[in-house]
């Protein structure tokens, strides 16, 4: 999974920070309730953000409870609802197919992926039954990605489009048709942004292992570092996707979630993208972590 989609902490009030934390903990609980303890390991900020996009506009009910990760202090969380359930189901499906893709990649170690597949097999079967349409799109687009990788596709747009269409499919169950169209556009460009940021983040490892990375073939890179031309071109592409996300965001009233989404689209993505390009995101990950109401990092 990725974990790149995070709001800017500087732009969030204490109330909104706590609200995001309660959604994150709520998603963790729903994953555990629907799919067991192993499924909680795939929890990330990206699908928390998806649940927020799908959430109704009004303030949700907030509860407090201890959990296995924090047994000595109660954590605020939102109980299960359709938005959290959808995010949980689709995160299981995407995680499963990403694991299968990793197992088919000759450039990666297999032991941890075999273990992950074993832990998620039952969960995936249940999630597939619940979200068959999303599962079908995920399989189709990841297979398309696999073919592009085999062909050493030199385009950034083609593989990014495959992942973008995959994520846009998550909007399919939004009830309101106008909101569905808004989310399709927002999630499409978010998916495109995630794919390209992940390619930049993996560049050094992919170059060393000989794994496919579209940046290597698009810019003819001779090392695991971006040239000035490649960096400039990638920044333009990433910024373009963010601007289109912002345009979609402005077309819908997201109610109590507006500030969190705004802090993500208008600043959080820029900050994460910059950190990835500077090579500081992985080493400084804690600086991007969200804190709950009790000031504990999520």
Predicted regions mapped to residue ranges:
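Acidic catalytic motifs of isoprenoid enzymes
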Residues: 1-185, 192, 196-231, 235-239, ...
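Long, low-complexity, intrinsically disordered segments
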Residues: 288-298
